[in-house]
């Protein structure tokens, strides 16, 4: 099954409206080309830098701290943000979510699950979550 269908079906199963799911798909298409291993600014043939980066994170050659702080967008949503004052950030949370999931870092369903986790547990996304569930307009 294509990434488009996997993502769409997972979003719909979580309660996102058809238009909301299509809107997220459009955003993630622009962010990553819907490639879950996509590293920011990797325009190489076959995404060789993205695959090498993913392998290095998976093998521990890039540590949790390095992954979180390198300011390189990663994955479907190009998670990047890190707050050096608080030591928290979206990419750090992606890393921790991935480790607990038991799935591959570049697993599409894991990344969609993480996005849904952000949308439903982070107060700053409450209004966006409401829109994604109820909108009928892309």
PLM regions and their residue ranges:
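Export/targeting segments at the very N-terminus of extracytoplasmic proteins
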Residues: 1-34
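Peptidoglycan-targeting cell-wall enzymes and recognition modules
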Residues: 2-6, 32-133
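Short, intrinsically disordered, charge-balanced linker/junction segments flanking boundaries
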Residues: 134-138
């Amino acid at each position: 099954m294509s990434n488009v269908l996997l993502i769409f079906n997972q979003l719909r199963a979580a309660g996102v409206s058809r238009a909301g799911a299509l809107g997220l798909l459009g955003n993630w298409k622009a962010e990553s080309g819907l490639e879950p291993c996509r590293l920011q600014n990797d325009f190489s043939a076959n995404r060789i830098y993205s695959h090498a980066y993913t392998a290095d994170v998976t093998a521990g050659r890039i540590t949790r701290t390095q992954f979180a702080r390198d300011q390189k967008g990663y994955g479907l949503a190009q998670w990047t943000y890190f707050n050096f004052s608080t030591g928290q950030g979206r990419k750090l949370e992606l890393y921790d979510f991935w480790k607990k999931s038991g799935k591959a870092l570049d697993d599409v369903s894991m990344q969609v699950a993480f996005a849904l986790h952000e949308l439903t547990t982070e107060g700053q996304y409450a209004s966006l979550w409401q829109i994604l569930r109820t909108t009928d307009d892309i």
